[in-house]
Amino acid sequence: MESSLVAIRALMSMRLPAQIVALCGNNADLLTEVLHTAETAPAHLKFRALPYTTDMHEWMAISDLFIGKPGGLTLSETMASALPMILLNPIPGQEEINASSILEQGMAVSPTDVVTLPYKVDLLLREPQRLAVMRERMKQVAQPRAAYTILETMLGVPPA
């Protein structure tokens, strides 16, 4: 079974009310499975499953947490959005290095396994001050203008 679906099913045991949005990309099978899983969700949990979207930044802007893998692009987007993260299943190598850095800097948490995922989500949702600290830390570390800064440096243009 796909690790994303395992995580979504694990979230069914959350205790706090929540809306969970699963962005399934172009994975039609995952989309179907999540929709099927959502039919059995407890009343306090609302599940949505969406196919590929170009509006990821809008979904991040209205979210309290991001749950997913620590790939480079994902981390760039979550940091630019100051969206606290719960990191799952990093691939050995670059994703493990990314996860280690983000965790050490206090911008994310990582459950020991998928079974503890609902506990971590409930814990963070119960502690808005902790989420605020994580968001602030992300704002301090993020460099959303990094590409412009590199280009300006290469071209010898004074920073904007």
Question: Which ranges hold each PLM region?
Answer:
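Donor-nucleotide binding loops and adjacent catalytic segments primarily
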Residues: 1-63, 96
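Short alpha-helical segment that forms part of, or immediately flanks, the ligand-binding pocket
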Residues: 57, 75-81, 100
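Acidic donor-binding loop of glycosyltransferase active sites
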Residues: 61-71
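Short hydrophobic beta-strand element within catalytic cores of glycosyltransferases
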Residues: 66-68, 84-93
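Acidic, glycine-centered active-site loop in nucleotide-sugar glycosyltransferases
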Residues: 82, 97-107
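C-terminal "capping" alpha-helix adjacent to the active site of nucleotide-linked donor transferases
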Residues: 104-105, 113-129
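A short, well-ordered alpha-helix in the C-terminal region of glycosyltransferases
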Residues: 130-144
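C-terminal alpha-helical cap of glycosyltransferases
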Residues: 143-160
